[in-house]
Amino acid sequence: MSDARGDPERASRAVGDWFTAVYDDLTIMATACERELRNSRGTKARLTERNLRAIQPAATDFLGRHEVPVAAGIVVGPNVLGNDLGAVEWWRRGDSGSTQRIVFNLSPDDPGFYDFVTFEWFNEVVSTGKPAIQGPYLDYAGMDKYILT
């Protein structure tokens, strides 16, 4: 994008092209996640939290194709897994390049509860059914680190 400096239209196109490429690849990741979840669930009526771990290869592949996103995964709304809380299955690329699972605190009575259903990024996607860009904002509760999203 450095070649676009000084030309707002080219800079805007470069940013738009970057986001388009990432969103296109997220569609590929979503398809892979869907396949892995279906295979993991097998003949059971509902997914379980344990089934969600099957998305690790898709998240790892996505992160391997992109330098900027350092974490990827899926967010499952309340009642999809047969619980009232939903789930976040998120994988982060470490310094070594390997992926580690991030565990979110989804217990409403605990300090540091990650109440994702109240966040604008979750509600916009649920209400529109389309990808959304939110931020930038600092998200402290999500990964116990300050991250710019």
Label every model-predicted segment.
Residues 55-56, 117-118, 148:
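Amphipathic coiled-coil/heptad-repeat helices and related helical stalk/stem segments
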Residues 10, 54-60:
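Short alpha-helical segments and helix-capping/turn motifs at coil-helix boundaries
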Residues 1-50, 147:
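Juxtamembrane extracytoplasmic/periplasmic/luminal helical "stalk" adjacent to the first N-terminal
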Residues 50-51, 113:
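Residues that cap or flank secondary-structure elements
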Residues 16-18, 34, 59-67, 125-126:
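Short regulatory alpha-helical segment in sensory/regulatory domains of signaling proteins that mediates
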Residues 65-131, 136-144:
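Extracellular/periplasmic ligand-sensing ectodomains of membrane signal-transduction proteins
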